[in-house]
A protein has these predicted regions:
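Auxiliary Fe-S-binding modules of radical SAM enzymes
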Residues: 32-89, 93, 99-100, 283-399
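A structural motif corresponding to the C-terminal end of an alpha-helix
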Residues: 195-201, 258-269, 337-340, 364-375
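Conserved Radical SAM active-site core
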Residues: 80-116, 120-231, 235-243, 251-264
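Short beta-strands and strand-loop turn motifs
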Residues: 5, 171-174, 270-274
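Short terminal hydrophobic/aromatic SLiMs and anchors at protein ends
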Residues: 1-4, 8, 12-19, 23-26, ...
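Conserved strand-turn element in the central/C-terminal portion of the radical SAM core barrel
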Residues: 205, 237-239, 245-248, 261-282, ...
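Glycine-enriched alpha-helix->loop->beta-strand junction motifs that scaffold or abut catalytic
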Residues: 224-227, 268, 294-298
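Active-site glycine- and acidic-residue-rich loops that bind
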Residues: 210-213, 277-286
Length: 399
């Protein structure tokens, strides 16, 4: 009489075990079950099968991990398809929310980011390496394992009320998009904007998200007081290319419409042609600027593709998957602009690179903005209207 192990039944061809193949063989031999008669499927979590609708194709470990995880084909069928990765949001209570920098090539010295990670999933995002500080992967983790900071408005109010605080424009969206999809549920960006508006504090916002239209009531009021300007990033006008490299970002035409609606509300808008990818999206530079101008943008800027740390292998993996015929040429152009390396992090070099190709793109930009009548300097914002917030329980000033 033959005994069939409980988890492997001849009548259930689709059954599977989550064990090692060698252990399955020993188990079947011990129960005198001919191994060749049964198909045992191994459940294996492969990111390639689960990354549909995401920018990154893998979830490689970060530079701080001591061990590297790799997939190996053991000859078994991969089993039933696992569901696509879902976005997970956890909560962080920050001690501070304003981050200061001394970078000479940035037009601001402070910023706030109310989320860590970004569901937009732009494969080229230079902020991906920041997820490594959290013990997470700059790959798929960056766009699926997000962190919200719901106490950010209260912390911001406290920092603005500090006696030693000196007012200067704050940037929002420098690391992750403040209007990414999870903002619809959490509303942290809107609450922070209200704090800034009440205090008369200037703010510059960078986004790709349509959700900014929800806050036109606050933004238009701040614009009338000279307290806000907005940058809308448009990487390409090609909808197919956009879906591939920034899968959860509004389509290019929709982003141009955001510019139009903000401009109609009297909000100063900049069209940001960034990042420009050589031999892929940079031929569209003039068309992007023209579309932004037609929609009401007052100013324009551009940045070349940046590949810091873990971003380089992610982008190269993406190029090999979607544009194998251009991958070599694109990487050659980037290395040409960064002294033979994938990326040069030096101030003044990192944003646009150097060399003939970088200068050619810069010259095209200068000619285009002059022809279109676009400014390159941002709209000036006022700092003289700032009044420190009065915290609950604090004594109000008599003067």
């Amino acid at each position: 009489m033959r005994h069939t192990p409980r988890d492997v039944r001849p009548e259930s061809y689709e059954s599977h075990l989550i064990v090692r193949p060698d252990r399955v063989k020993r188990l079947l031999r011990w129960h005198n079950v001919p191994f060749m008669f049964y198909h045992v499927r191994m459940t294996r979590q492969t990111y390639a099968m689960r990354a549909l609708g995401r920018g990154a194709a893998s979830n490689a470990v970060s530079r701080y991990d001591r061990l590297t995880r790799t997939e190996e084909d053991d000859g078994w069928d991969a089993g039933e398809a696992l569901p696509p990765l879902r976005t997970e949001v956890s909560v962080e209570v920050p001690r501070s929310i304003i981050t200061y920098n001394k970078s000479p090539d940035l037009p601001f010295d402070r910023s706030i980011n109310v989320y860590r990670g970004c569901e937009h999933g732009c494969v080229y995002c230079f902020a991906r390496p920041s997820h490594a500080y959290l013990g997470l992967s700059p790959g798929l983790d960056f766009e699926t394992r997000l962190i919200a900071r719901p106490d950010a408005p209260q912390v911001l109010q406290r920092e603005l009320a500090a006696r030693r605080y000196a007012v200067a424009p704050i940037a929002m969206g420098t690391n992750t998009d403040p209007y990414q999809p999870i903002e619809r549920e959490h509303g942290i960006t809107r609450a922070c904007l209200q704090v800034l508006s009440d205090a008369g504090h200037p703010v510059a916002i960078v986004t790709k998200g349509t959700l900014i239209e929800r806050d036109i009531d606050i933004l238009s009021d701040m614009a009338r007081r000279g307290l806000v300007r907005v940058g809308i990033s448009v990487t390409t006008l090609d909808a197919r290319l956009s879906r591939l490299m920034e899968p959860r970002v509004p389509a290019p035409k929709r982003r141009i419409e955001i510019i139009r609606r903000l401009a109609q509300a009297g909000i100063p808008v900049r069209v940001m042609a960034s990042p420009m990818i050589p031999a892929l999206s940079d031929p569209e530079l003039e068309a992007i600027l023209a579309a932004g101008k037609d929609a009401g943008a007052r100013s324009a800027s551009w940045i070349m593709l940046r590949l810091p740390r873990e971003v380089s292998p992610l982008v190269q993996e993406w190029l090999a998957q979607h544009y194998p015929d251009r991958a070599g040429r694109i990487m050659a152009r980037l290395r040409e602009m960064h002294g033979g390396a994938d990326y040069d992090s030096r101030w003044g070099q990192r944003m646009r690179g150097t060399g003939p190709y970088a200068e050619m793109v810069a010259q095209r930009f200068r000619v285009a903005v002059k022809r279109l009548g676009l400014q390159t300097a941002g709209t000036p914002m006022r700092c003289d209207l700032f009044r420190p917030p009065v915290l609950p329980g604090a004594q109000m000033s008599l003067f």
